[in-house]
Amino acid sequence: MPNFKSKKIKEINLPYSKDDVEFLWFAKNDNVSLIYTKVQEESFFLQIKKAQNGFVIKGDKHTKPSKIGYLQKALKIFKEGFCEDIINEAFGLKNNALIEKTPFIVDNFDELLSKLQGKIYIEIGFGSGRHLLYQAKENPNVLILGVEIYNPALTQVAKLAKAQNVNNILLIQSDARLLLSVLKSKSVEKIFLHFPVPWGKKPHRRVIGKDFCKECARVLVQNGRFELRTDSFEYFNFTLEQFLTFPAPKFSLRKNENLEISSKYEDRWKKQEKNIYDLWVWNFNQECQNYELNEFNLSSVEFSKEDLKKIEQNFKNITIKKDDFFLHFESIYKQDENLLLKVAFGAFNKSEHCYLHLDKTIDFAFKEPFKIQENIKAINELKEILKVQFKI
């Protein structure tokens, strides 16, 4: 991630703005300061962390913007305005950095859902985008939705789509399991998962699992198809076993079949003479219904100044685990007389991180997490823990 190291930080007087970058307020604890930053339509934190002989300034990994150019620009402006004696830097704002809003990248699920219509294919972990762009060109009347956890991949593929005049794609940074959980039932024609990380020694980290397979069955249309392509026979066999739990699925199994398009990983494996396995699955016959989304209802929580002092004094790094969700209180920061709380929460296999701003009331510092049931339960638990565990 882009960053730089400085020996000295000048006094930070906010708000401060320059060249479409705004630094609005900051919160801090003993080790870290967070600068609330806006670049055009996106908000995120810059993080200042004490280090040996200076400070490291970088983007907060849980709020980083969808376009790396936004972060690079914010770092440049902060360095010029507030830092002295730069020790080193690992970022550079290039003239061709993708800073302007692109129609190919959506920033959140609400924006995504508003743009979904017609036939939809999903590619999970599209990487360099070769297969995704190929599908888009071959199927101009289909919307190709790419989900990827790495920001640089989104930026790269958006640039390629623009250069190649491909207009039927949408890209989002997300965990694929979380994405599937917010889609309507029977709304997707195909789901591609090509060369996922096998996680041989940590199978619990695989995207494939019973819940994932159920979600695939729910969102796929009648005779919609899931397609896995992998060089790992263990992963291939594991995936087959997961889908065999359905009543009457149909499968197509293939080995070392050449497709019209080859990813860079596939090219590498073929040079090493590795076997390539394909698994297609359809005919799930799954009874499905769309989930009813509830609200977080944070308006029911109110704080006095004394309450905030008690929360700050009694704060502990604790984790609460329930049957289908967890809640982890990670860090607390002071912002004038108010507090900023960092928590991780949600389902065990699709957790989220967020910052909560506490003054007279409580609210999300950035956009709301999506309203899946595990997140709703975790936030309800948080409201109770604030009262009981932190003695307000």
UniProtKB/Swiss-Prot annotation:
GO molecular function ontology, one term from the record: tRNA (guanine(46)-N7)-methyltransferase activity
SUPFAM superfamilies linked to this entry: S-adenosyl-L-methionine-dependent methyltransferases
Binding-site positions, S-adenosyl-L-methionine: E123, E148, D175
Entry EC number(s): 2.1.1.33
Keyword Disulfide bond: no
Any GO CC annotation of this UniProt entry: tRNA methyltransferase complex
Binding site residues for substrate: K201, D231
Keyword Transcription belongs to the record: no
Keywords, comma-separated and alphabetical: Methyltransferase, S-adenosyl-L-methionine, Transferase, tRNA processing
Pathway as given in its UniProt record: tRNA modification; N(7)-methylguanine-tRNA biosynthesis
Catalytic activity, as annotated: guanosine(46) in tRNA + S-adenosyl-L-methionine = N(7)-methylguanosine(46) in tRNA + S-adenosyl-L-homocysteine
Top-rank taxon: Bacteria
InterPro entries: SAM-dependent_MTases_sf (IPR029063), tRNA_(Gua-N-7)_MeTrfase_Trmb (IPR003358), tRNA_methyltr_TrmB_bact (IPR055361)
Family the UniProt entry places it in: Belongs to the class I-like SAM-binding methyltransferase superfamily. TrmB family.
Cited function: Catalyzes the formation of N(7)-methylguanine at position 46 (m7G46) in tRNA.
Gene name, Swiss-Prot/TrEMBL: trmB
Name this protein carries in UniProt: tRNA (guanine-N(7)-)-methyltransferase
